[in-house]
Amino acid sequence: MALDPADLPDDVRGFLTERHLATLTTMRPDGTPHVVAVGFTWDDEAGLVRVITGGASRKVAHVLAGSPRAVVAQVDRARWLSLEGVPVVSRDPERVAEAVRRYALRYRQPADNPQRVVLEITVDRVLGRA
């Protein structure tokens, strides 16, 4: 079922706060999908998915090489969501700190990583049911 990212139902927003891992799909330069497990956070006000990662990761390289879209998919039994949108990589210390803060609230405090960046996906399509 397609959902409006700007007006998600309460059960969907609740599902996005539960402690689950997800998959992140980016596109390799040859057009094939690269799928990895990630922790992520959802910013309902900004319509953003945030994924913290090392600056030298393949997912970052794919986005910097022009991966036009990214998808984060979270599944828990019969509940599932796919959040699709346009990815960007930010090295801005304030944006990275905000992503780390949100990650720590949902999962745990991540280890220090001076090379950390944040992958931000502006979500324009949500599919699923929670």
Regions found by a protein language model. Give the residues of each.
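Sterically constrained small-residue positions within well-ordered secondary structures
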Residues: F15, G31, W42, Q74-D76, ...
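Short beta-strand segments
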Residues: R19-G55, R69-V72, L83
